């Protein structure tokens, strides 16, 4: 009997089972213990293969692929700390709903807790963060192929959102020629190999029912809060709110067109807050809200009813409002709850939103990161997409810009970490094959610098704007101790990215004016390659501009 041959047949069943649950993208890191899984993936023509040498970046690459494809993405890594490096992407997927299937190779049980090399306790290492975990036994013909495939189907059928961790131990030898070992075991699945459906099919209903009193609530004074959603959902939500005559507060990830722009500015105005107090119902569609003033208002508001609609299960309201938590796809929910044409009930808020926008526009000529956020609409590629980093940049875009309705916007706003942002953006581009503009800060770029290797393979123009404000300037907005702010919070690195781009053979520009940025972008959008554009800005201007605008708008 050939152990290596049967390992590969066992792995072939695992990978084939994944195809029956919509998996098309497989992300693979190099490793020896994962050889059976890697070879099985390589031999399966249903897969598109992606490789990366860094498992942390690989997990985020898969996250980006899943964001766009809306299908589960598989990740294959070897044993040991390679597995632990998937933790950040797994956590993010659990909070934002992308579906990942983590296939982690492992040593067999007899090599755990005995000092064997590269052997750690992998089973259950991710605690409660995966939606499901499955620890497979060592491959053996004593266990039927039917057990293996039906066990996988049972776990994968429950993957509504988040990650599944499937731990796969393999004994040595891992290499060798294929022979007939396990052929009959594999063939016991019969014509399943020629089929395209799961061995075990399970139906699971998640959609919420129509709220029978909706006809009553839609006649009341309401507010619509739009969080993270798809581009198509964003357009539908905007039309729905407009028909109802309800003010729409749109997050940067809502893709609603933000008809009341600069919400995180005007929500700091007492007149706006007073008018919003008249709302009898708040309907929040989508989660992961960004703006500080929006979150403060959301926590303090006390409507008669607060409804949250999102396809992700679980609690999504840190303010714990009295109301309804409805699990549904946003587009489906809107169809079940049609709007009734009514006149807008808000008077002050549209005026304040326009005045806030004009206050921001009056500062647009200065070369800085706040102005970049305001101008970002002008730099979006036609028929393309935007990926927004975390920390200060996403807050500035949320507060100071107005993105087009239905324009795709992606970000990692679940755990909101600065790790893996470039890798995630690379996955977004690969899955969509669209022109992509990605914006991150300098520390975020340093954190994921080796992801520039992924940007050597793009299928459409990709522009990475690194806003270099020399450190974590988000902390300038917080009451951090002034005496220790630079040393322990901002941590300026005093670096530039020209040599990093050159190391990966990527085009690079460092514009010092809006005209130079326009020229760099015009050239970048003409070729299907990656261009790194570094905007070196004054350290504190972005944070200070936001604070000045908040003060100005609060007194309108």
From Swiss-Prot:
Pathway(s) this gene product operates in, as recorded in its UniProt entry: Quinol/quinone metabolism; 1,4-dihydroxy-2-naphthoate biosynthesis; 1,4-dihydroxy-2-naphthoate from chorismate: step 2/7; Quinol/quinone metabolism; menaquinone biosynthesis
InterPro entries from the UniProt entry: MenaQ_synth_MenD, MenD_middle, THDP-binding, Thiamin_PyroP_enz_TPP-bd_dom, TPP_enzyme_TPP-bd
EC number per UniProt: 2.2.1.9
GO terms for MF: 2-succinyl-5-enolpyruvyl-6-hydroxy-3-cyclohexene-1-carboxylic-acid synthase activity; magnesium ion binding; manganese ion binding; thiamine pyrophosphate binding
Enzyme class: transferase
Entry's family note: Belongs to the TPP enzyme family. MenD subfamily.
NCBIfam families: menD
Function: Catalyzes the thiamine diphosphate-dependent decarboxylation of 2-oxoglutarate and the subsequent addition of the resulting succinic semialdehyde-thiamine pyrophosphate anion to isochorismate to yield 2-succinyl-5-enolpyruvyl-6-hydroxy-3-cyclohexene-1-carboxylate (SEPHCHC).
Protein name according to UniProt: 2-succinyl-5-enolpyruvyl-6-hydroxy-3-cyclohexene-1-carboxylate synthase
Organism field: Citrobacter koseri (strain ATCC BAA-895 / CDC 4225-83 / SGSC4696)
């Amino acid at each position: 009997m050939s152990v290596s041959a049967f390992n590969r047949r066992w792995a072939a069943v695992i990978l084939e089972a994944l195809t029956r649950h919509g998996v098309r993208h497989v992300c693979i890191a190099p490793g020896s213990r994962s050889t059976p899984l890697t070879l099985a993936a390589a031999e399966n023509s249903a897969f598109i293969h992606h490789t990366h040498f860094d498992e942390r970046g690989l997990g985020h690459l898969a996250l980006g692929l899943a964001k766009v494809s809306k299908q589960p993405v598989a990740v294959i890594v070897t044993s040991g700390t390679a597995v632990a490096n998937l933790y950040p992407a797994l956590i993010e997927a659990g909070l934002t709903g992308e579906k990942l299937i983590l296939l982690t190779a492992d040593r067999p049980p007899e090599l755990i807790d005995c000092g064997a090399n590269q052997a750690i306790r992998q089973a259950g290492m991710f605690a409660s963060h995966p939606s499901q975990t499955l620890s497979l036994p060592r491959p053996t013909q004593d266990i039927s192929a039917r057990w293996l495939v039906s066990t996988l189907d049972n776990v994968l059928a429950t993957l509504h959102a988040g990650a599944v961790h499937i731990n796969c131990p393999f004994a040595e030898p891992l290499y060798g020629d294929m022979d007939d070992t396990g052929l009959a075991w594999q063939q016991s699945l019969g014509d399943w190999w020629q089929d395209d459906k799961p061995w075990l099919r399970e139906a699971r209903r998640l959609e919420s029912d129509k709220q029978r009193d909706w006809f009553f609530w839609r006649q009341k004074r309401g507010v619509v809060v739009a969080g993270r959603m798809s581009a198509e959902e964003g357009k539908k939500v905007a039309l729905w709110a407009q028909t109802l005559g309800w003010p729409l507060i749109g997050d940067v990830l809502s893709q609603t067109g933000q008809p009341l722009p600069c919400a995180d500015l005007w929500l700091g105005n007492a007149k706006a807050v007073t008018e919003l107090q008249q709302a009898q119902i708040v309907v929040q569609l989508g989660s992961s809200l960004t703006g500080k003033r929006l979150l403060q208002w959301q926590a303090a508001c006390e409507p008669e009813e607060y409804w949250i609609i999102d396809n992700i299960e679980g609690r999504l309201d840190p303010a714990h409002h009295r109301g309804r938590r409805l699990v549904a796809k946003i587009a489906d929910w809107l169809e079940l709850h049609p709007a009734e044409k009514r006149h807008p009930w808000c008077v002050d808020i549209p005026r304040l939103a326009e005045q806030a926008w004009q206050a921001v526009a009056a500062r647009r000529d200065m070369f800085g990161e706040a102005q970049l956020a305001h101008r970002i609409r002008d730099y979006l590629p036609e028929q393309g997409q935007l990926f927004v980093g975390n920390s200060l940049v996403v807050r500035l875009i949320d507060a100071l810009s107005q993105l087009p309705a239905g324009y795709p916007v992606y970000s990692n706003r679940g755990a909101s970490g600065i790790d893996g942002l470039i890798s995630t953006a690379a996955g977004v581009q690969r899955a969509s094959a669209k022109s992509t503009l990605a914006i991150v800060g300098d520390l975020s770029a340093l954190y994921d610098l080796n992801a520039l290797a992924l940007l050597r393979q793009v299928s459409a123009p990709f522009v990475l704007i690194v806003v270099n404000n020399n450190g974590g300037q988000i902390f300038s907005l917080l009451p951090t101790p002034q005496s220790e702010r630079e040393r322990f919070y901002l941590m300026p690195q005093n670096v530039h990215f020209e040599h990093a781009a050159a190391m990966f053979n990527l085009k690079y520009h460092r514009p010092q004016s809006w005209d130079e940025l326009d020229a760099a972008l015009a050239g970048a959008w003409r070729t299907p390659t990656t261009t790194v554009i570094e905007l070196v800005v004054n350290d504190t201007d972005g944070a200070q501009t936001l604070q000045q605008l908040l003060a100005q708008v609060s007194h309108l």
